Amino acid sequence: DTYIYPLLRGREVSRFSASPSPGSCVVVPQTGMFGDEQLPATSPQLFQFLARFKDTLETRSSYRRFQRGKPFWSIWTVGEYTFAPYKVVWKEMSGSNFVAAYVGSERMPDGTEKTVVPDHKVYFIPVQTEPEAAYLTAFLNSSSVSGAIGAYASALSLGTSVVDYFKIPKFDANDERMAELSEMGKRFSSGVVPTADNEQRLDELVARIVCGT
């Protein structure tokens, strides 16, 4: 169905690894701030299903506060970023263990490839390319950065502002340091386990990128 996407939950996120459980999906009945008004015509079965919960859906605080008068199937915090080709993700923290990964698309039961949508307890940075996603993932997973985030987790807003907070330079494929960091992020995300030397190299590259050396 047009409005069904693979769902990524926090427990499915680990260091350099994130993948939705088989069959885990979510309904996203819109592409912008409000529910798609064409849904009853384009997906009548889905509309009939959602209509069974109309009263409950209309009592949601986010709906009553921000979307009153809009289709009752509207959900909050949906925009272009929701459907970005790649997302750098990390789960809501309950302790000091910060880890990041990135996701792209997953194959649905009908054979189509659809972008992964994180649930409300997974923070993410939307990006357009895999090299940039791999770069950011490696940057965040370096011991210096992940340790700092973990140490100050209670004082930080761990949304996309983490990029600004740590002044993460924008990815430039022509920068050899960033390109190497990106390749490392991609390699470790494919299942290769980082060695002690790899971990040291991650920290070295991050330090050079931040300091401009």
Walk through the language-model features, giving the residues of each.
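Polybasic, glycine- and aromatic-enriched phosphate-binding surface used to engage nucleic acids
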Residues: 1-177
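Non-catalytic DNA-recognition/assembly elements of restriction-modification systems
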Residues: 45, 166-213
